[in-house]
Structures are given as C-alpha cells and as structure tokens.
Amino acid sequence: MSLDPSSFPRSNSPASSDSSLTRSRLRGKEGSLKKDKNYRRYASSVERALSLFDNTLQEWADYISFLSRLLKALQTHPPDQPVVPHKVLVAKRLSQSMNPSLPSGVHQKALEVYTYIFNLIKPEGLSHDLPLYYPGIAPTLTFASLTVRPLFLSLVETYVCDLEPWAIRPALKAIILSLLPGLEEETSDDFDSTLRLLNTLREIASRMDTQRPGAETNSSGQYFWQCFFLASITSPSRRLGILAYLNRYLPKLGVTDRRPSRHEEVDATAMPLEMQVAVDSVILPEPGLLIRCFATGLTDEQVLVQRNFLDLLVTHLPLSSPILQTRITKDDLQRLIVAAAGVVSRRDMSLNRRLWAWLLGPDPVGDRASFEARPSISSTASKTAAESEELSQSQYFSRFGLQPLASGLLQLLKRDTELPSEKAKPFRITLSLMDRWEVGGHVVPAVFLPFMRSVKAYKLAAPKAHFDEVFRSATSFFDGVESGMIFSELLNLIDWDAKSLANDAPRILDNLNLAHFILDHFNVREEDMVLNHAPLLTLAALIKMSELSSEATTSVAHDQLQAVSNGLSKVVTLLTGLLIDRAFLRKSDSKNSVNEPSMLLDRPGSAILRQIHQFYDRSRNSLDLQPPPFPPTDLADLIIKNVYEQAISAVNACNDAKSIPERLNLLIVVLKKLPRSRILRDKRLYVAIGKHIQASTVELSTASFSHLSSMSTTITSLYCIHKLGYYITYEEVSDLIPPLVRQLWQFLSPLSPKFHVEAVRCLWNLHSVSWSDHLVESTITSLMFTPPAPGSYQLSSEEEAGRYFILWNHSHHGTYELPPKNLQDSAQSQASYHSSMLERPLFTVLDLLSQGSTQPAQVVQLWLQDLPSVAKVFRIIISKLEGVLHRGNQLGTFEGNTVVSPDDYAECNYLFETIHNVLGALNHNGWVSLLTQTMAHNSRRHDASASEDNAEAPSLHSVVFQASLKIVSGYKSGTATANAEEVKLQQISLLVMRQLLLGPGVEELVESGIDSLLVDRLYSMLDEGGDIAIQAALIDTLLAVLKARFSQAYLPPPPTKPKHQRGGSREKLTSPSLLSFTSDKPEKSSVLLPSPEPPQRLLDCLLKGLSSPRSRAIIDKWIMLLCEILPIYSTCIFQILLTLVDCLGREIRQSYTNLQSAFEKTEGWPKDRPEQTTISLLTGFETCIAAAHERLLMEEVNAPAAKSPDQTHGFFGNMVSGVFASDSNHPRSAAMNNRLTVLLSFQDAVRLCFSIWSWGAAERSSLPQDTESIASFQYTSLRMRNRSRRILEHLFTAEALECLETMVDMWIKSDRDTSPLIFNLLHTLDGSRPKIAIPAIFNAIYTRTNPAALDPSRKSTMTTALTETELAGFLVTYARSLDDDVLDEIWIDCTTFLRDVLSNPFPHRQILPRLVEFAAILGVKLENTNFGEDRRMRKELGDVILRLLTAIFTSKPMGFTQEQGLLGRASLDYDSSSIQRIGPDDMLSILVASMPAFSMTLGDMDRITTAVSNISTNIIGPFIRARLFPNNLNTSFMALMQHISKIPQVAKVWKKDVADAFNDPRFFGSQLDLVKGGWMTLLRQWALVDKDRLSEIMTRLTPPATAGIMFGVGASAARLDADRKAQLNLRRISLLVLSTAEDYFIAEMPALLQKLEDLLGATASSSPSSATRAEIFMVLRALILKSTTTTLSPFWPLINSELQEAISAISSGNQQELYNPYSLLQACKLLDTLLVLAPDDFQLLEWLYVTDTVDAIYPPEQFEPTALADEVSHNLGVRWSTSSDPTRESTNLHHGVRYPGLAADWIRETAKDEIVDRVLRPFFDQLSIHAFESTYSISNPNLEACRDDLLADLFNESTMAN
C-alpha cells in the first residue's frame, strides 16, 4: 500500500519539550524520578525515539520504524520503575499513529506498543492514565481491518475490563461507543467477542451501581443501561449495533402475549418480582433515557433501524406495559407514541404492520397461530371465556394509546416552526393512521377541530406559499375523514346552549367563524355530504338563527348578538349553497320518523335539534348505516318552514336594517333549491309585506332602500319560481307593485345620485312581471301628476320630472333583460317592452315644455339639451304621429285636409307642439342626432361609410320634415270657414318646418345700456336673495343681449376642419366664437379687432354667481354665461385669468368633496347636486384656460420674432417640429408674463383634474363605506374620471412639456399609493404617449443642463422647481413602466439624445449615471422585442453604454467622491416614487440594476470585458484601495461584485479585485452583514475559479523561529508584526473554509494540519509567538463546522491534546506565557461548538471534558468528577462576578434547538483581564449538567448560530496583535 509521505503531518516542536499539561493525575511519579540516573537515561532514550516522529517520517514504513524504536526504548525501563517518560507526548504520537489513512500494519504495531505500555504500567497505572491512552484507540473499530480488530478487542478485554470500576465509570459511555461498531454485522468473527465484552462491562457496571444510595445489590447494571441508552440517543451511526444488543439482552418490560382484560388494572407493583428487578435495572435512575432511546431510533433516517425499534416495542415494551402507563411522565409517553406514529410518513407497509401491532396489542388468543398441539375441549372453553374478557383492539388502543397520541399530535401542531413541511406533519400522520379504523376512529374526533383551528390561524400568520403547502396536507386529511364525523363536529360548532350566549359570546363567535372557514375552504360537496348531511346541518343552523331573534336573547348585549347573528348568517349562506333538490326527492327509508308531517312541523326547534344530535351520536357509536332522522320531503318542509317563519318575523319586526334583506334573500334561495312546498299557501308573507309597504313612510336611508329592494326582488322571484303564480298569484303581485313603485320612486331624487342605479333596476324588475298590464308605467304616471293649486293648471312638478329623467337615463345606460320567455307576447318586440314603461310618463314630462318660461319647462329643456338618447324621444313621438297619419290614409279625404281626420286634429296638434317644444330645446349634439339617427333602433347614418341599406332609411330629421310637409301640403285653401284646430295645426306644422330649415337664428341687436342694467339686477339678487327662476331668466336675457351686442366683434373666419371630424366634448357649452383646444398656431394674417367695453360689474357679478350657494340649482346657466362672455374679455384675459381659475378651482374642490361624502355616509349626506355641479364647473374651468391659451397663441404669432444667431444642429435642432410649437420664438417681457400666467393656470388644472381622476381608481380600492350604493358609486366616479381625463387630454395637447413637468413635480411629492396612478394616467392619455412624453423629458432636462444649445421653441419656461437629477430619476422610472412594444416609437429619439449628450457630456455630468440606467432599460426592452433582432441597433446601444461609462469616469472620477460617503446612501429603490430615495450619483446601485442588461446588450465578449475592466479600474479598485476601506462598502458594492462574478469570461478581472480586498490587512474590519450576504458568496466563487487559494495562503504561514532579534528595541515590534501576519492568514483560512462547500479543501487538509502543528510549537518569545493560538482554535472551529467525519479524523489527536492543555491552564494560572485570556476564550468556544454539534468522534472524547453520563444529574455517593470542566469549575470556585450569568441565557434550548453558550455579543466586548471571571467561570459552572440536559432534550444543533459566532470572532479586529 503506497502512501504519499507528505500527507502525514509531523510536529516540529522538539521532542524533549515536556508537555504543559499540568494535571497531577497525568503526571504520575515523573517529578520524583528525575533525580534518578537510571530514569534519566531511560527517559533520554524515549525522547530520542520520539524525535524520529518529527524528522524522519516520509512514508508508512517510517511509522513502523518509529514505533519499533519507541517500543525498544520503552523496553529499556529499569525493573523498579514501571513508568512511561514523556507519557503525554507518547500518547499523542501513538494516537497519531492510529490515523485511519495509515495501513493496518502501522495500526498493528501501534497496538503492540499500547499493549506493552498497559502491561508495563499495570492496572493501577492504567486506572490513572486511562484518559491519556484510551482516546487514541477508541475509534479503532470504525476503520480497523480484520487483522487489527481482534488485537483491539483483546487489548480492551485484557487491560481495560480489568480496571477498577471507579476508573471505568467516567469512560463507560465512550467505551460502549467504541465497541458498538463490532456488533453491526452479526455474521462477523468479532461479533461474539464484542458481545462478550459488553456483557462484561454490564457486569462491571452492576458493581458500580452498589455505590449509589438506595441501590439494590442485584440491580443488574443500571448504570450500564443508562450509558447504553445515552449512546443510542447521541450516536445514530451506531444504532445497528445497539439494536443487536437490545434484541438479545433487553428485559421484557410488560406482558406481550395477550391483551389485558376489561377489569384488569395496570399496576407496576402487580408485576412478578423478577420482572420488577429487570425493569428497575433498565429505567432507574432516569426512565426518560429508555423512552428517548426508542424515540430517536423510531425517527432514524434508516428504515431498517426504525423497523427493528418497532419490533422491540412489540416484543419488549407493549403499549399496555405498566412502565409506559405508570412509571414515566405523560410527556415522555407522548414523545414515544408520536415518534412511533411518525413512521407512517415512510409509506412502508412493513413499518405500518409493526406499528398497528404495537398500537392495537397482541392478536386475540383464537387468532394467533400456535405451534402446539390442538387444545382440548375444556381448555378451548376456558380460552373462549378469557377471550370474552380480553379488551378488543379498539378498546386496547382507546385505553392505553388514544390520549397520549392525540395529545402528542396536538403538541406537534402547536410547535412554533417556520417550515411548512413540519407544520403539515401532524396532518399527514393522522391521515395515515386513518388506514385502521380502530386507531383513526378514535384519534380523528379528538384532533379534528384543533387541526382545523390550526389551519385557520396559520392562514393569518404565514406567507401564502407556506399556507398553500400546509393546506394541501390539511385538505388530504379532511377528505379522508368520514362525512358524518365532519358534520357532527360542524353541528357542535354552530349549536350552543342558549344560557351561555350572554356569557360566552366570543367563544360562540369563534366557533361560527371556524365553521365558516371549514365550509368555505374544504371540499364539502361529496355526494354523501350534500344528500344526507348538508340538509340536516342547514336545518340546525336555521333553528339557531330563529333562536337569536327570540325573546330569550334580550339579556345579550346588542353588539354581541349582532356579531353572532352575522357569523351564523355567513354559515347559513354557505350551507344553502350545498342544497340540491335531489336530496329531498328520494324515497324515505327512515324508521323512526314522526308519522304525521304536520306533527313534525309543529315540533319545537330544540326537539328537532335533539333528534339531529341523537342521529349523529348513533352514527358515531355504530358501524352500521343509521336511518336519517327525518324523511326527505319532511326535511324540505322543515327547512322551508323555518326560513318562511323567520322571513315573516323580520318583515313584521323591521327593527334591524339587515334582517329583512337577509331573511327574504335566504327564503328565495331556499325555495329555488328545494322542491315545491305548500308551506307558503297561508299567504302570511304576502300579507306581512303588504302591511309593511302600506304602513311605512318613505325614509331616504340605506336601511329603507335595502328593505324595498329585497321586497321587490322577493315578489318577482316568488311569482316566477317553479311555475308562474305557484307561490304568489298575479293578482297578489298586482296589489303589491303600485305601493312598491311609489316608494322606490322617492329614491330617484335628483338631489343626490345615491341609489339611482339600484332603484331603476328594481323598477325594471317589477316591470318584467307586469309589463303586459303597464302597472309600473301607470303608477309612475300617476305619481307625476300632482293636484293643481287653486286657480292654476299644473301637469307635473319639477321634482317629479327630475326623477323621470333619472329613470330614463339609467334605463338607457343599463342593460335590462327582457322578461322570461313565458311572460313574452310573441307579437310584441323589445322596443314595445321598453316603451311600455317609459312612454306615457315621457309625454307627461314633455308637456311641461308647453308652459313656456316656467321653471319646470326649463328643467326639461336642459335635460333634452344634454340627452345622448334624444333620438329615442323622437322615435316615440314620431311613432305616435305616424299612427295618426296612417289612420288618415286609411279613412280617405276629409273636408279641409286630405291627410288627417278632424277627429285626430287635437292629437296631431299635440304631437306637433311637442316636437316643436323638443326642437326648441335641442343643442348642437341634439341636432346632430336628429340628422344622423333613423327610426330603426341602434342604427346611425354615416355620411361616407354607411351601407346602401342604411343610406336608404330616412333620418329622424327627414321623417319629421316630411310629416310636417304632408300636413302643410294637404291643406285645402278654398274652404269657407277655417276650423280653429286646423289653423292651429297648420301654424304649428309651419313652425316646426321653419325650425328644421333655419336652425338656431341670431338675435337682433338690442339697445346699448340694457346689459349693465341686467348685470346690476343680477348682482343685487345675489346679494339680497331671490327666486332661482328669476336668476335663470336674467341670465338668459343677459346672454341674448351680449350675444347680439358683441357677435360681430369677435367672430373670426370659420376654421377649416376635416370633413367628418366630430365636435369636441366642450363645444356644446361654448360659443362658436371660441377657438378649439389645439396647439396649432393660427395664421399670422388673422387680425385682432378691438372689442367694445364690457359692462363694469359683469366680472364681479359672474364671480359672485359662481361662488354663491344660491346659484347651485342653475349652475349650468352661470357656466354658460361664463363661456359666452369670455371673448368679450379677450384683450384683458390675462389680468382676470388667475382670479377666475382660483374661484372655479375652489368651488370645484368644495363640490367634489360633497360628492365624495355622499357615498361615504349612510345618512345625512349632502344634497346640493354635487355631481352636476362638479361637471358644470369643470366645463367652465376648461373653457377659461382654453380661451386664455388661444389668446396667448394669437399674440405670440403676431409678435415680432427675434432672430436666433446660432442654431444647434443635432437632436434638438432636427427633431420633428410641431410637437411643442406652442412656445413663441423669442417673447417679449409682457408676453413672458402672460405665458407665465397661463402656465400657472395649467398647473392648477393638471393638479385638480388628477385628484378627481384618481378618486375612483381601482388601484386605490377606495370603495364607499355604504356598499348598498356601490353601483351608483361606480357610475358616478367613472363619469368624473372620464370628464377630468378629457380635460387633461386637452391640456397635454396644448402644453405637453409644461403639463408633464407638473406631473413630474407631483410624482416627486407623492406617496407610494399615488405614484403608480401618475404613470397610469400618463399611459392613458393620448397627449402624453411615449412618442411625445420622452422627447418632452429630454427638452426639460436640456433646458436645465445646457439651455444655450437648445432650440428656443423647445425650452421649458421652468415654472416648476425641478432639477435635472429629479427629471432624470423620473425618466428612468417612466421608461421602466413602458411596454416593451413602444421601443420602436422612441428608439430614434432616445439614441439621438444619448449621442447628443455624449458629444458634450460635461454639462450633464450630474445625470450621466442615470442615463446609464436609462440605456440599460432600453437594452432590456430591446431583448424582449422583435425590434431588437437587428444587430445594428444592439451594437449602437452597446457603443452608447461604453461611451457613457467612459464619460462618467472621465468627468467624475469615483476615487474623488466615494470617500465622502457617496455610497452611504440607501441603494436604489425601483418602486419608490420619492426622488430623495434615488441617489442620482449612486453609481453602484445603478450598475447593480443595469449589469444584467449590460451582458445582453453589449453582446460581444470584448465589449463586456472592456466594460467590466472600466468598472473594476474606476469603481471597484478605488473603493478597495480607499483610505476608508472596508467601511466604505455597502450592499450595492457587494451586489455589483456578485453580478460581475457570474460572468465567466471576465474572471481574470474580478479575481484580482477579490484577491486585493481579501489580502488587505483591513479586510477583517468589514461589516458582518456584508460578509454573510456578499463576501462569503464571492469567496466561494473565487475558490471555485482559483483552486490554489488555500495553498497559497498556507505558504505565508512560517514556523515559529527563536533566532534573530531576541532583545533590543526592534524585537517586540518584529514579533508583533509576525504575530499579526500569522493571525490574518489564519483568519483568512478560517473564512475560506467557512465560505466553501463541505470538504472542499480535502486535498489541503494534511498540509494544513502540519502548519497548525508547527504554529502550536510557538512560545511567548518566538516569532510568531503563542498569541496566534486563538486563531488556531478558530481554524479548528471552521473545520468542525465544514468537514465530514473522515476528513476530520486526523485532527482529533491535535484537538484533544491542545484543548486539554488550554482548559487546564484556565485554573492553574501558570500558562499565561502560552495562553492569553483570548486564547483561553477561543479554546472554550471550540469546546462549546463540539458540545453543540457532538460529532461522532468527539463523543469518544467527551467524557474527558464533561461528565457525559447520568452521573451529571444523579451522582453516586462520594462522587468525584474527573471531567476537565468539573475540575476547572471546582478550582475556579462558584463565586460570581458582579454581573449576572448572561452566558447561560443563550445556552437555554430554544424550541428544541441547541445554541452555543458563548455566542453573546457582550462576550466579545469584555475586557481582557475580566474574561476568566465574567465569562469562563459562569460557563464552566454546571457545564456537565447543561450538556446532559441538551442531550436529554433530543435537541438539534443550530449550525447557523455557531457559524455566525465564528464570523463575529473572525471580524473582531480588537483581538489581533496591534
């Protein structure tokens, strides 16, 4: 076997140097023998032999030679001196010779030397030196060859077993662990020898037990068994050997061949004496160790181990054993039974069979296969009798296992764990346990509800992904539970004792919420559930619901009662969704049902509930299917009767706003889902609803409307369910509809938009069942007719007309379906259905127009002017007119007229008057509708694109004209006497014709001066108060006067428009004199004519009228006045603009606030027409700004242009003109002031419109508090959003740059909720599409960076205080928000801009980093679209990015700025809208965000390398070399480094940067969070790329040297320098090992071990000195955390010897030259880490440091602990320092996790001279007890805490030589 000589480390420490181990027991008699000449000669020969280990070992044969020399030297001992000189070093070298990597020949020779030494020192010497020698041979069986194993076993048997029991006692657990590998294979040659050895140890241990107080002399090895169980708990790798021994020698701890009888008591004292003695030997003094031995074995990773432990349970430890039932704690039994149940997760049948055998007990006597002869008849009879007394399997489990298993599962459920797999474990275990009904049938009822509560609570606390994983397991569990059990538990949840309601309402509510959660989240729709259980549970819930409204609940607080009622209602809603008619149509198979259904229906609810409970109780206690408690048909009647009675009670009581809608809706749902029932035949509900409607007065509140809405729905639904008129007849419906319509009509008040949509929906609902009889129409018509006052004639009031307008508008906006097919008359069309409700009331409304200038007539006129569906009004009138004309054609010729019968004169006259009145009310849009719409519904005539069919259909305009033409042309002029009616008919017909032919005319000029008088009158009325109608009349008159007076002064030539361009939305309220909202400049030739002076007080009057509350009802009139008079003020509009804008803005905000509050309040909301007021004011606002802007354009066009001397050519000179041409070329000072005034108004308008637009935005989820009016809210908010968006569209079209700057300013000051809305708006508006917005941002930036180079027409006026950095931040965020597809629109603009910037980068130096980010965003979008497939574009962008980086590094070198805290800013926050959080100079954050795009965009490897090299040279390098390093680094720097390290081709670049940083002496001053989150990942990558990193660092570690300067001035400084270098390199090694994968540096381990050996030879005066010992211990900690058992095995001799020396030095105080306090602390931390992790090989050494057996808790009499920790604690004493014991705080177990005890931060801050007193003394006090408790708790080590503590120590610079 060839070996690499270099792989075996040797120490360079001189062999003659005596060990510093000061423990007297290991020193023996050497001190007194040193004067003996023979001994000195003997010791010298041993020393010479030992020196060979350091100098001559090159290959494995040298080891044998060394061992032979050592043996010969030992054989020269004087006969009278049986001692071993330098025995500590001898033991260490022998231990190193037992290295597993050496061949077996070396091991044999080493064991030969051990044998000689043991023989030499005799048992007396070995008893004292066992801690010295045994650790060296303890691991032998884990690696020994077949030839070595017998030698080891013989050595133990001959010498170790021969020692005194007191010497073996501390090491017994370690000896057992060392022997157990020999039992793993029962067929091996060493198996019997090992078994014999263990039995010998058990016999020796029984002699030890007699030393314990109260122990029996025949206790049969209590101490052995306790150590044996501990070995099983702590060492999973040795459990196969443990099982082999337990199977043979573990006593039976209970009766395993039969189950106890029903009356047999389980008592430990009833066991036979022999069994009691055996039991005591196993479980005393600590029974918990036996349980933990089994519990850990049952949770082992190997199936074989689990299977064998289950076998042991079945054969040796039955569930009925008195030990389990009486001798151990309940928690321990829970632990054992849950561990056993946990094997089901393996889904292994062999495991499950054994588990069932243990949980259910032995098979019955008759079932067991017997190997004996057939029993006799008499014995069979006696056995049968015994059998009948035996517990059944189900009873056995229920008695012995149910309670601990259920409690254990619930305890498992309550564990606080972050892992969803652990949270789901109880569900999976229980699901598998349900495979056996004997177990699952008992367990599931005990855990079902707690499991469901746990899932519900977990949903609220856990992330969605975690909850989903747990919920999948919970769903599987739920689906496995029997339906009857589930609904039985649900029944218990919703059923409560009526007496407990007042005192226990929170618990009842919690149960209801849980029931709702189960029904809502789990599958309760299985066939059995919906057919058998859901109806019963629904009935029970309905009974409980009726109880809540009974008199018994009067003592319960109202809010509690309401909460319980709401919870129960939610449950009932879900339950009714489970009802299906099939469940009630089945044949009855019930045997115990009541004979008469009437008797059943009359039974009280409590009796029915009791019967349901009895049904579920019978089902639970019987395996047979139980008959249902009620026949299906009776059950349906019971449900319907309950709901029916509650509905009647709710309607009669009407004391709860919600109860009526809930109960009525519930009734309808139930009736629809259940078969027909005769319960409702008594008509009590019909009578109750009728009384309620007749008795109640209309109150405008949410509750009142909710009642009406639900009743109207109930009536129509009852009429239509199953078949028409089954539950309620048509006559009964006809009786209820009129009063309902009368009450619903009140909710259509025009004073508030609340409930409009809902009320109209209810009216159409009622109309759908009664339309053939026109019930709703006739009722509405009757409501519109009001009794006239004396001496007057009034058809309808203004208020009633307003209600009808709302009905009309929402009837045409909403989509109301046709009635059910069985209600339709085939001859009737959809049109007749709609008109059958709207026609008669329409004529009633239009009749008001005939009243001339009265207020109602004006209201109707205003309605018609704004009516989009005015064509439908004409269709209804014309259809009537055509009917009259058609009758005339059929009847023939009449006297005086050939068209109309004299009998129809009145009707025809009436219809023409109506048409005349409607035409008189039309506005421009109305005329357009008249010209384009036809009589056919939903058709429109198009001038150019209409089809031929449509073109042939005459327009409404044409139809009316033809009808009037018919009347006129049919008149006979030759009659003698003219009928007055006929003359009137002619007059009205001609009038209609004239209207159609002329359209709106121009009023004649009026006398001057009347306008001032009217203004004064209007002003005084506003002051003094007066009728609104007079105000309106005055305004109309004034408008007419002003129009006539000023029309010629401001009428320009008509603008040219496209042929089919549609008019703007604002034109309908403005004079045609106003210019349209456009940014196109007027022609220069247009001459500004002088205007007459307006009346003096006109403006003041206007402002007063707009802001007066008295004018709200006619606000439209005031706005019209404003719009019409604006041209009068064209010359001075800039002086009055801000005043107007301020007034209008204030009023808009007030009105808008009122509108918002209307939808938030449920009562007492504002009723001042806020909706219409806001719309009207917005129109005036828009018109004002439009007029001012158009006047500004005209003035700028006519101003003399100043020539610009130098025009730049480039992006800003060449961009397509006309986008922002609204600026003048070179405005004068006055013009600049005018422009500023207009732009300030624009800003106000943008901010105001945005606030309105964002009201109903879905992103804000700002639903009104009153959900009853949600539809109206959505309609109103959408209308507001559309209006404000149109204004914004116009504003952006006119002044895109200024509006965009305003939006940027709002974005900067906005919060996180508002910021996305700003971008949503920009994406919505056509005027701010990317093609316009991106160049505008460029213009805004260039205006601030280099305005001289910008074309003057493109400059911003800078009315908003924005900086270029804020604009650049907005540019980046806006670009990121754009869709990838818009790239082709903005590509040329963006690249031209970037190139333009690069041509002169200095002015833009502040925003260059932002432009890099912008270019990177373009790169990402380029990759995501087909547009980016052009390589030329990618190359172009790559060039720009490279040039930008160069420009940044040239204009602003990072080295100059980074030390000034450049990177102290927070990193880039993409989602933040606050510019303050986005540092424009934070180049690192920008590069982090952009690096992924760089690698895609740059494409070519040379370019990527160039970019990374630039970044490395200009950013990374300066940071690493900076004076502030490493404090100047942050997460952005680390993220940038990690991004670069993922690009494999540039490894050469970043490797150097990492190496520079890592080798910098200041590196270990880095922040810990950066190390964990950044450097460790980088170092892992670095080690993968450069595999020689560790070797290279190790070459810098020089062995300690004593030559050179020993004294003098420079000696101390040189030594300190050498110490610091060694410490740094050792820390680098530790960090590299920690950062890489486990065993990554396995090849370098031998060399590292040699380096550590060399450094451990240092003294206080060497160079480097012994000050490096602390870092050596850190390296060992890192190795323990990151190495496997095999890799670590050569290090244990070194670890053991050094750790013992260091800990011994703590109490001795004479080793200060070798161990400073910090070295001692690190040694203790190494021990702490070993105790937490407990590696297998350390368990063989653990007894040297702590008492690792039960003696730590139960010490025998006169016990003197030999463990180091106990000795140190004894020597230091138990006195405390002034501080408390903080170290022990962190050693506590946190939820079953072991934490290191020395990891607290305060320990690192403890002064050097206080470490022993404040830190180490408390640490060693009771360390053995704490170590034993952590083992006993079966806790898992917290590797993360150990790693973090080591990192904190590594990066603690205060402990290094300085």
UniProtKB/Swiss-Prot annotation:
<feature type="compositionally biased region" description="Polar residues">
    <location>
        <begin position="1070"/>
        <end position="1079"/>
    </location>
</feature>
<dbReference type="GO" id="GO:0070791">
    <property type="term" value="P:cleistothecium development"/>
</dbReference>
<dbReference type="GO" id="GO:0000139">
    <property type="term" value="C:Golgi membrane"/>
</dbReference>
<dbReference type="Pfam" id="PF24597">
    <property type="entry name" value="TPR_DOP1_M"/>
</dbReference>
<dbReference type="GO" id="GO:0005768">
    <property type="term" value="C:endosome"/>
</dbReference>
<protein>
    <recommendedName>
        <fullName>Protein dop1</fullName>
    </recommendedName>
</protein>
<keyword id="KW-0333">Golgi apparatus</keyword>
<comment type="similarity">
    <text>Belongs to the DOP1 family.</text>
</comment>
<keyword id="KW-0677">Repeat</keyword>
<dbReference type="Pfam" id="PF04118">
    <property type="entry name" value="Dopey_N"/>
</dbReference>
<dbReference type="Pfam" id="PF24598">
    <property type="entry name" value="DOP1_C"/>
</dbReference>
<feature type="region of interest" description="Transactivation">
    <location>
        <begin position="1838"/>
        <end position="1854"/>
    </location>
</feature>
<dbReference type="InterPro" id="IPR056457">
    <property type="entry name" value="DOP1_C"/>
</dbReference>
<feature type="region of interest" description="Disordered">
    <location>
        <begin position="1"/>
        <end position="33"/>
    </location>
</feature>
<dbReference type="InterPro" id="IPR040314">
    <property type="entry name" value="DOP1"/>
</dbReference>
<feature type="compositionally biased region" description="Low complexity">
    <location>
        <begin position="1"/>
        <end position="23"/>
    </location>
</feature>
<dbReference type="InterPro" id="IPR007249">
    <property type="entry name" value="DOP1_N"/>
</dbReference>
<feature type="region of interest" description="Disordered">
    <location>
        <begin position="1052"/>
        <end position="1092"/>
    </location>
</feature>
<dbReference type="GO" id="GO:0005829">
    <property type="term" value="C:cytosol"/>
</dbReference>
<dbReference type="GO" id="GO:0015031">
    <property type="term" value="P:protein transport"/>
</dbReference>
<dbReference type="GO" id="GO:0005802">
    <property type="term" value="C:trans-Golgi network"/>
</dbReference>
<dbReference type="GO" id="GO:0048315">
    <property type="term" value="P:conidium formation"/>
</dbReference>
<dbReference type="InterPro" id="IPR056458">
    <property type="entry name" value="TPR_DOP1_M"/>
</dbReference>
<dbReference type="GO" id="GO:0006895">
    <property type="term" value="P:Golgi to endosome transport"/>
</dbReference>
<dbReference type="InterPro" id="IPR016024">
    <property type="entry name" value="ARM-type_fold"/>
</dbReference>
<dbReference type="GO" id="GO:0075307">
    <property type="term" value="P:positive regulation of conidium formation"/>
</dbReference>
<keyword id="KW-0653">Protein transport</keyword>
<comment type="function">
    <text>Involved in cellular morphogenesis. Required for traffic between late Golgi and early endosomes, and for the normal structure and organization of the endoplasmic reticulum. During the vegetative phase, contributes to the highly polarized hyphal growth. Required for the reproductive cycle. Involved in conidiophore initiation and differentiation. May have a role in controlling the balance between vegetative proliferation and developmental morphogenesis.</text>
</comment>
<dbReference type="GO" id="GO:0070798">
    <property type="term" value="P:positive regulation of cleistothecium development"/>
</dbReference>
<keyword id="KW-0813">Transport</keyword>
<keyword id="KW-0472">Membrane</keyword>
<dbReference type="GO" id="GO:0000902">
    <property type="term" value="P:cell morphogenesis"/>
</dbReference>
